[in-house]
Amino acid sequence: VIKFIILKNNPDTYLIGKLTEMDEEPSILLEDSFRVVEEGLLKVYPLHTEQRFIFLTSTDVLTILDPAPAVLAEYQKAVNE
């Protein structure tokens, strides 16, 4: 399931990726992760690594949201490149 994650310590950071919730901490796996920097423009996240997934604890996350259709389309295009 493709979702937005907004980080608690930086609510202006929107991460998008394939979200998997796990039973134990770290409780969230975000695969094929990108950061939305402005109106649907995606940047790879994290920077400076080939790793395209991140683990987050439940205390890192402010909220989880569904992306807008236009952003979802851009994400799917970016993942398939």
For each feature predicted by the language model, list its residue ranges.
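Conserved RNA-binding domains used in RNP assembly and mRNA/RNA metabolism
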Residues: V1-E81
